[in-house]
Every structure is written in structure tokens, then in C-alpha cells.
């Protein structure tokens, strides 16, 4: 009887894991595109975007972190079930590998976004200093 319950639990957990993996995959694609598109700043400082790109990025990051935590929890539950064959062991390992890959991809995207933001901040401050220098040197002539 316990074996039949384990099989039902296994199938339910496997289905949940696949659903979360698909959802995470789609969100990572959107997250990656958002990270790439944030490089373009508005030329006219009077224009203000309706949603701050960094705010949207952080919200998406939070959503993905929550999904990754859920997937980790499901993988842990799967690991507690008694495997009844090589196929089940392989499937458990595959889900763990997918989670690891998603975490690596998520961290890479987030780190690239932070590096791009830092670079843009630095370039922006250098541009301001150059403009200030031009204005001051123009007055001294």
C-alpha cells in the first residue's frame, strides 16, 4: 500500500517539478531580455518611464527566487521518496541538475545586470564631470 502511495506522490511531485521548471524557464528568458534592454537610458531627462526598469528587474528577480525555492522544496520531497528503479533515480538527478542550471543562469543574469548598472552609473558621472569641466573652462576663456 505504501508503495502505491509513493507512486502517486512521485507522479504528483514530478508533475509539479515540470510545471515549475517550465515557468522558471519562461521567466528566465523574460528576465534575460529585461536585463539586456535596460542598457538604453532616456536621452531627455524630462521623460520618466511609467515603471522604473530596476524596480521591474528586482520584482522579477524576487519572483524567480521564489520559484527556485519551491522547485528546491519539491526536489527535496522527491529525494525523500524511496526510489524504485534506475529511471526514478535518473529523473531525480535530472531535476536537481535542471535546478542547478537555473540557479546558475539566474545569478549570471543578475550579476550582468548589476555590472551594467554600475558601468552606466560610472559613465554617467564621468559625462557630468566632463560637462562641468567644459562649462567652467568656457567661462575662463
Go through each PLM region and give its residues:
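Regulatory linker/N-terminal fringe of the SNARE motif in t-SNAREs
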Residues: 2-16, 23-141
Amino acid at each position: 500500500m505504501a508503495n502505491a502511495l509513493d507512486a502517486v506522490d512521485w507522479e504528483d511531485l514530478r508533475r509539479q517539478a515540470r510545471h515549475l521548471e517550465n515557468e522558471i524557464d519562461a521567466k528566465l528568458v523574460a528576465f534575460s531580455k529585461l536585463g539586456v534592454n535596460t542598457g538604453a537610458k532616456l536621452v531627455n531627462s524630462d521623460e520618466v518611464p511609467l515603471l522604473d526598469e530596476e524596480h521591474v528587474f528586482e520584482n522579477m528577480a524576487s519572483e524567480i527566487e521564489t520559484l527556485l525555492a519551491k522547485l528546491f522544496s519539491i526536489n527535496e520531497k522527491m529525494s525523500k521518496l524511496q526510489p524504485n528503479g534506475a529511471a526514478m533515480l535518473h529523473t531525480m538527478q535530472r531535476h536537481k541538475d535542471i535546478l542547478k542550471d537555473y540557479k546558475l543562469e539566474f545569478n549570471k543574469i543578475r550579476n550582468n545586470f548589476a555590472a551594467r548598472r554600475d558601468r552606466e552609473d560610472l559613465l554617467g558621472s564621468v559625462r557630468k564631470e566632463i560637462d562641468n569641466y567644459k562649462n567652467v573652462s568656457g567661462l575662463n576663456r
